[in-house]
Amino acid sequence: MADVTPSRTGQVSRKTNETAVSVALDVEGTGSSKIVTGVGFFDHMLDQLSRHSLIDMDIKAEGDLHVDDHHTVEDTGIAIGQALAKALGDRRGITRYASIDLAMDETMTRAAVDVSGRPFLVWNVAFTAPKIGTFDTELVREFFQALAQHAGITLHVQNIYGANNHHIAETCFKSVARVLRTATEIDPRQAGRVPSTKGTLA
């Protein structure tokens, strides 16, 4: 039988006076990634996002890292969100909703998503240190704010407990990856319909 899986890919190039970011992703991927942002910890987190969502990601970012990591992280979130929105199109046939409680050693983080076309972030995550290595922990929220806004998704992230800041950050990325994987999957019972009584997710 022929493969009838729809092509769901998105590409975005974004250039400002502060950054140049290119993103190509495939929602129907296997979680392979090629990521270079110049921010080592951020690259590690994006690899987790790709691997556990099964969304293939090719990301290249060049930013004003001599200032700090903020613009690079935020603009990468914007570009990933825009590419995801392009890949999902009118969101016809998707599962739409997903949630998970994700454990990593001593840490537990909850994520829930509605791939609704309505951007919103509820963030209930507190770090106990301002940095993980050289990476500002406040940038984790900035990334997900940019992603949610430009992907057009409602995203809730709550760290239930945890002691290690690396683990807290990593469970945020992994839990969001897992809910994106589920919510963006095609539900055959939807029969190609938009999963909304309004008939549109926009």
From Swiss-Prot:
The keyword Amino-acid biosynthesis is assigned to this record: yes
GO CC annotations, alphabetized: cytoplasm
The protein's name in its UniProt record: Imidazoleglycerol-phosphate dehydratase
Pfam families: IGPD
Phylogenetic lineage: Bacteria, Pseudomonadati, Pseudomonadota, Alphaproteobacteria, Hyphomicrobiales
Reactions it catalyzes: D-erythro-1-(imidazol-4-yl)glycerol 3-phosphate = 3-(imidazol-4-yl)-2-oxopropyl phosphate + H2O
Cross-referenced CDD domains: IGPD
HAMAP family in UniProt: HisB
Coiled-coil segments: none
Keyword Lipid metabolism attributed: no
Primary location: cytoplasm
Alphabetical UniProt keywords: Amino-acid biosynthesis, Cytoplasm, Histidine biosynthesis, Lyase
EC class of the enzyme, as a word: lyase
Originating species: Sinorhizobium medicae (strain WSM419)
UniProt similarity note: Belongs to the imidazoleglycerol-phosphate dehydratase family.
Gene Ontology terms for molecular function: imidazoleglycerol-phosphate dehydratase activity
Its EC number(s): 4.2.1.19
Location in the cell: Cytoplasm
One annotated GO biological process: L-histidine biosynthetic process
InterPro entries xref list: IGPD_sf (IPR038494), ImidazoleglycerolP_deHydtase (IPR000807), ImidazoleglycerP_deHydtase_CS (IPR020565), Ribosomal_Su5_D2-typ_SF (IPR020568)
SUPFAM superfamilies: Ribosomal protein S5 domain 2-like
Pathway(s) served: Amino-acid biosynthesis; L-histidine biosynthesis; L-histidine from 5-phospho-alpha-D-ribose 1-diphosphate: step 6/9
Gene3D superfamilies assigned: Imidazole glycerol phosphate dehydratase, domain 1
Origin superkingdom: Bacteria
